[in-house]
UniProtKB/Swiss-Prot annotation:
Name this protein carries in UniProt: UDP-N-acetylmuramoylalanine--D-glutamate ligase
Native organism: Shigella boydii serotype 4 (strain Sb227)
Superkingdom field: Bacteria
Lineage, uppermost ranks: Bacteria, Pseudomonadati, Pseudomonadota, Gammaproteobacteria, Enterobacterales
An individual GO BP term: cell division
Enzyme class of the recorded protein, top EC level: ligase
Gene Ontology CC terms: cytoplasm
Keywords: ATP-binding, Cell cycle, Cell division, Cell shape, Cell wall biogenesis/degradation, Cytoplasm, Ligase, Nucleotide-binding, Peptidoglycan synthesis
UniProt-listed Enzyme Commission number(s): 6.3.2.9
Catalytic activity: UDP-N-acetyl-alpha-D-muramoyl-L-alanine + D-glutamate + ATP = UDP-N-acetyl-alpha-D-muramoyl-L-alanyl-D-glutamate + ADP + phosphate + H(+)
Binding site for ATP: 112-118
Pathway field: Cell wall biogenesis; peptidoglycan biosynthesis
HAMAP family: MurD
Compartmental location: Cytoplasm
One Pfam family from the record: Mur_ligase_C
């Protein structure tokens, strides 16, 4: 455990994570200073009076006088103020690094462009099914520091690339990169390999690395080694097996579960289940309770969630598809009897949308593109695309056209922040309109 006594600590970024950092230091007899570029950041009213605060900008004077800077994942390490501090030899960490220095129980660590919240939650459910006292959080749910507890027997953390950039003490019992596709390119000017390099930090000092056999970018730089266990659709130690119209989860040739016993559906969710099972096995959880958890887990909201089935039409909310890879995962192997009415749009974060084109070739696809990058998305297949300003306009346009056997899918391939507070608000709006129009 690290000793912070007498240290001049500056925390950048408030919100729930920032407050958890403040509480962490106060509990150790250190009063940090806090700054946030927002004038009235969330959590400002909960900050103890003794804590000095600076809002509306970064305070370079405070930063250059600090012994330790705890940076929110929301601020890029390339920011000139942080670069200057790093050049001056000032240590810069994040909340996950603070957590890793203190945690006494094993950690399962999960990252990836898509599927990480589902897999994190699923491994947590597997641990609970085994009667293990588990703490689940990080980039999902509770900030990691709020999970620190002497009673905890296992931690399951979802970690973003931004969190991993400031973490060096992670020693996971099992770690995975589920997949690597373009995301956050606005934060990674050197492209996909720079983004991948941040993700790869999760494997440093990991006991077992769970890699995706279908995605070479998830492999450690030096290639797979004896620490690696793999999962994949048709390849890998954990894979899918198709026999006589049935699909099974299979581990090293042994069939362990028929997917019809699972509440989750879709090929991307079956591979998520394989990854979760590989992590649970590596963490020493009993296989039987892990499989039981797979049969009861219903999935997370806004992730390929069926919000309405009416008159033979399925309305599916996949608002969490905030990047191209996530929408690809939803479309890959998708079975629709009639026409797919696909809603795309929002803020594409400088991504290349062209990988989606191959899924949009059929006669039974109609595109409804909205938001900041709607025109770019409509250009993928202009002859079947319509462009509107908002998602609501798009849904009112498509509603009279749907027939029994059709599917209406919101899988936007974009962030929501151009028109919504977050992807949850976008998904809730879709669900509300589906119930009104369907």
């Amino acid at each position: 455990m690290a000793d912070y006594q007498g240290k001049n600590v500056v925390i950048i970024g408030l919100g729930l994570t920032g407050l958890s950092c403040v509480d962490f230091f106060l509990a150790r007899g250190v009063t940090p200073r806090v700054m946030d570029t927002r004038m009235t950041p969330p959590g400002l009213d909960k900050l103890p009076e003794a804590v000095e605060r600076h809002t509306g900008s970064l305070n370079d004077e405070w930063l250059m006088a600090a012994d330790l800077i705890v940076a929110s994942p929301g601020i890029a390490l390339a920011h000139p103020s942080l670069s200057a501090a790093a050049d001056a030899g000032i240590e810069i960490v994040g909340d996950i690094e603070l957590f890793c220095r203190e945690a006494q129980a094993p950690i399962v660590a999960i990252t990836g462009s898509n599927g990480k919240s589902t897999v994190t939650t699923l491994v947590g459910e597997m641990a609970k099914a085994a009667g293990v006292n588990v703490g689940v959080g990080g980039n999902i749910g509770l900030p990691a520091l709020m999970l620190l507890d002497a009673e905890c027997e296992l931690y399951v953390l979802e970690l973003s690339s931004f969190q991993l950039e400031t973490t060096s003490s992670l020693q996971a019992v099992a770690a995975t990169i589920l997949n690597v596709t373009e995301d956050h390119m606005d934060r990674y000017p050197f492209g996909l390999q720079q983004y991948r390099a941040a993700k790869l930090r999760i494997y440093e000092n990991a006991k077992v690395c769970v890699v995706n056999a279908d995605d070479a970018l998830t492999m450690p730089i030096r290639g797979a080694d004896e620490r690696c266990v793999s999962f994949g659709v048709n390849m890998g130690d954990y894979h899918l097996n198709h026999q006589q119209g049935e699909t099974w989860l299979r581990v090293k040739g042994e069939k362990v579960l028929n997917v019809k016993e699972m509440k989750l559906s879709g090929q991307h969710n079956y591979t998520n289940a394989l990854a979760a099972l590989a992590l649970a096995d590596a963490a020493g959880l009993p296989r039987a309770s892990s499989l039981k958890a797979l049969t009861t887990f219903t999935g997370l909201p806004h992730r390929f969630e069926v919000v309405l089935e009416h008159n033979g039409v399925r309305w599916i909310n996949d608002s969490k598809a905030t990047n191209v890879g996530s929408t690809e995962a939803a479309l890959n192997g998708l079975q629709v009897d009639g026409t797919l009415h696909l809603l795309l749009g929002g803020d594409g974060k400088s991504a290349d949308f062209s990988p989606l084109a191959r899924y949009l070739n059929g006669d039974n696809v109609r595109l409804y593109c909205f938001g900041r990058d709607g025109a770019q998305l409509a250009a993928l297949r202009p002859e079947v695309a319509e462009q509107t300003e908002t998602m609501e306009q798009a849904m009112r346009l498509l509603a009279p056209r749907v027939q029994p056997g059709d599917m209406v899918l919101l899988s936007p391939a974009c962030a929501s922040l151009d028109q919504f507070k977050n992807f949850e608000q976008r998904g809730n709006e879709f669900a509300r309109l589906a119930k009104e129009l369907g």
